[in-house]
């Protein structure tokens, strides 16, 4: 609800970062988790990229599987409040979309379980039935656990690259280390389903 797609190709979202001091995606997140049906897959096509601007992905299957049995049992059935507060504030929107989704979700095709989280406090501020103060310490643990170096892939962009990922079992982070150098990437998202 906060983005503008190309008129000529309504499924294509242009991502331009010219002249910006930072990027809204410069944090660990899963795309559009505040929607009823967040995207299943995302595809990025690098049209013009500077040196730098890498994108990193964390494997949320591994993040879940590496948890202790006690932590898995505690998280089972917990839901998080995912909000679009960060994007809403950037565009001056008065309504903030929000949804509660499982913190551990089951992939509808593979049947595997993964951690389903996003980093910024204004994107996933709390667990259902808990306050932010109660939720943040556990969320911080889950974030740190998820992004251990051996659980992260870092892609060094080159013009012409096309990368696709499964938004249901990864988090990603766009590194903004290229100043105001031109960066032009197109994104297409494939419709997902309600997380379960």
Model regions: which residues?
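Non-heme Fe(II) oxygenase catalytic core, chiefly the N-lobe of the double-stranded beta-helix
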Residues: 1-162, 167-196
């Amino acid at each position: 609800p906060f983005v503008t797609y190309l008129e000529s190709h309504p499924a294509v979202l242009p991502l331009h970062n010219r002249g910006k001091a930072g990027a809204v995606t410069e944090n660990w997140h899963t795309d559009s988790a505040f929607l009823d049906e967040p995207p299943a897959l995302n595809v990025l096509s690098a049209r013009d990229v500077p040196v730098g601007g890498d994108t990193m992905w964390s494997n949320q299957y591994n993040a879940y599987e590496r948890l202790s049995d006690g932590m898995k049992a505690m998280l089972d059935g917990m839901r998080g409040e995912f909000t679009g507060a960060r994007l809403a504030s950037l565009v001056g929107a008065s309504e903030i979309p929000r949804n509660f989704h499982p913190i551990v979700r089951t992939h509808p095709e593979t049947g595997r379980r993964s951690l389903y989280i996003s980093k910024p406090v204004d994107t996933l501020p709390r667990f259902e039935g808990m306050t932010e103060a109660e939720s943040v310490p556990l969320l911080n643990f889950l974030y740190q656990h998820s992004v251990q170096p051996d659980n992260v892939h870092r892609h060094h962009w080159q013009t012409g690259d096309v990368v696709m990922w499964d938004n249901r079992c990864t988090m990603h982070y766009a590194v903004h280390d290229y100043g105001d150098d031109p960066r032009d990437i197109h994104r297409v998202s494939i419709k997902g389903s309600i997380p379960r």
